[in-house]
């Protein structure tokens, strides 16, 4: 999908992503509360800034929906310990960050009166690489770990091995399924290793996946969250 906010844009075709964010709200609010508990009390002489990163933030209303949910969790659960919240919105450099930044003014005008002070920055780059200094992030959120870091090497030969499909389906050869499963294991292991280095001790992650309800990887709609 394209950038901007036109008919074919991601912003206009992301209802499933919105559903995933709202469905994971209880887990996200729990994670915010747990991460908030890690912060030093005000008056300790040290900073009370919580760092939150949305990995694969996209562009459009869902990007700021995650921000809104995090801030809403502070308003409802974390009133006793004052805090500032630093958000990093991460996606590939090709993401339409300009659309995100243009929507910030309207978002700020509609903010909740009980939200803590917050700051939003864009962070272009792949989440399959280092993004933050050691032990610097309190909470990671991502909906995008279904996306692989690359096409498996054995599928780059030019031969069409998954003809007629844009993802794994009933007619996908078992050899192709195996290659993507191996790529997932490689990517997920790398992702967890990187985030482990970047998370503060006892930091939190909320990772939402889209898959199939059926245990058969070749059958069923790709809409199970």
What are these regions (language model features)?
Residues 199-205:
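Short glycine-dipeptide loop
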Residues 135, 187-194, 198:
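Short, conserved SAM-binding segment of the class I
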Residues 1-135, 148-172, 207, 212:
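N-terminal charged/capping segments associated with class I S-adenosyl-L-methionine
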Residues 139:
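Short, Asp-centered acidic motifs that coordinate Mg2+ and/or phosphate
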Residues 142-187, 199, 213-225:
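Mobile active-site "lid"/loop adjacent to the S-adenosyl-L-methionine
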Residues 24, 66, 184-191:
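Alpha-helical packing segments of well-folded alpha/beta enzyme cores
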């Amino acid at each position: 999908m394209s950038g901007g906010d036109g008919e074919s844009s991601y912003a206009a075709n992301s209802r499933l992503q919105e559903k995933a964010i709202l469905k994971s709200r209880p887990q996200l609010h729990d994670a915010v509360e747990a991460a908030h508990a890690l912060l030093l009390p005000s008056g300790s002489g040290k900073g009370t800034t919580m760092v939150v990163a949305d990995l694969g933030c996209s562009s459009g209303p869902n990007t700021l929906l995650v921000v809104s949910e995090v801030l809403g969790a502070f308003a409802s659960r974390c009133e006793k310990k004052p805090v500032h919240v630093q958000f990093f919105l991460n996606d590939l450099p090709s993401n339409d960050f300009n659309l995100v930044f243009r929507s910030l003014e309207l978002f700020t005008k509609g903010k909740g009166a009980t939200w803590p002070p917050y700051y939003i920055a864009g962070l272009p780059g792949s989440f399959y690489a280092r993004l933050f200094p050691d032990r610097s992030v309190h909470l990671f959120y991502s909906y995008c770990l279904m996306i692989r870091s690359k096409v498996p090497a054995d599928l780059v030969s030019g031969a069409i091995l998954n003809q007629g499909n844009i993802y794994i389906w009933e007619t996908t050869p078992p050899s192709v399924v195996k290659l993507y499963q191996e790529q997932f294991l490689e990517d997920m292991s790398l992702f967890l290793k990187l985030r482990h280095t970047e998370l503060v001790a006892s930091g939190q992650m909320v990772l939402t996946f889209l898959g199939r309800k059926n245990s058969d990887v070749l059958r069923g709609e790709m809409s199970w969250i």
